């Protein structure tokens, strides 16, 4: 096993005490990142159609009073790292029935390309006939003095997959679990017991990655729905770059900077130079031949994303937002020029402008109002009427028309509003319109959705009924010509005429 992905400080037994493990539970973002959950309020009824996660009793151990046992078992995992190095076995899949773990069989030699932690000091193992599995350890001072941009741009490589697979193999042996039980537990929105403690230990062992990144890849390892994009992939020629492709690029970059006598930071500056130097053009030409199944443009952009000299990737201060605003006024949307002036990725500048800065003080982060939701649905319906229904929705344009929410907020809210519900039949449309008519009549022309939701008895959420009402308004001509109350009464009468025809 390539233990260079670990923090060597943590290889000293006894370094992590029970107190430090308990204190790590106080970390923020202890929840995972299930798709669309962030920033959204979800109704328990919305999950009625989903698969009920089955948490194994073996993993539902109460943490109070049993932390010592969990910790001792986890420390034994660290103590057995040397044994794991000698075992090159993958997770056995015999115990799995319907869901199997997608383990890589791409046979990438993890010693053939640059390790993520060793990247900052240009350390590389030589591939020779008598090569061993001994890791190249970096002193704590070297880790501290690494270029700060490395952590933000860390790439998950074959070495990390190998290590994660072996960790899970040993974890299952320690707790006498099969991988089906682990997979069931990973369906839970929050981890418990020894599995939660293992994730916290992995966070300390792989400091280049956040807890969220580790959890995403762990769930992808066990084929949890929604995490397919993080799974271990071979070279496909499309989509995200696979493990083999990433390994080839890393090896080519290492060979190139060794030949040129550069540091990696110098290489990053060269590929981001205003005019691409001849040596860099030769590097790309050679790389295109190595990855001939890939489009040259996708390779070019992948290398620039993976190797860039910019330190900050996520956090923006108010001063930087104001600087970005001034640069857009001065240079327009020339993101390459703006990115060079601000020492940031051009795409980061573009996204920050598009998602935050251009809204100014109008941007809202609080809960959506009913008026905003209605306006969002109407905007999407209008755009779909203009364009082909099969085409993707332009969420940037939707956000621009709404004026108070970002494109991501609009997209997530629309998906929440239109999530799958029981289909409205003709009689149910009449039921819905009658409840809306009564609410309008009794509340001065206002719709009290909370009362209608109670009468629905959990069959539909407020969002689903609102979406259906907006669709009905588009279908029924009377809503274009009459006030809301009168149009609703007319629609009810029309539907009842149709129903009476069916009954006859």
UniProtKB/Swiss-Prot annotation:
DNA-binding interval(s): 335-357, 395-418
Record PROSITE patterns: HTH_MYB
Gene3D superfamilies per UniProt: Homeodomain-like (1.10.10.60)
Main subcellular location: nucleus
GO cellular component: nucleolar peripheral inclusion body; nucleus; rDNA heterochromatin
Keywords recorded for this protein, A-Z: DNA-binding, Nucleus, Repeat, Transcription, Transcription regulation
UniProt-annotated stretches for the region Disordered: 30-51
Pfam families linked: Myb_DNA-binding, Reb1_MybAD
Residue ranges of every copy of the HTH myb-type domain listed in the record: 308-361, 362-422
SUPFAM superfamilies in UniProt: Homeodomain-like
GO molecular function, one term: DNA-binding transcription factor activity
Subcellular location: Nucleus
Gene Ontology BP, a term: cis-acting DNA replication termination
Described function: DNA-binding protein that recognizes sites within both the enhancer and the promoter of rRNA transcription, as well as upstream of many genes transcribed by RNA polymerase II. Has a role in the termination of RNA polymerase I catalyzed transcription.
Protein name per UniProt: DNA-binding protein reb1
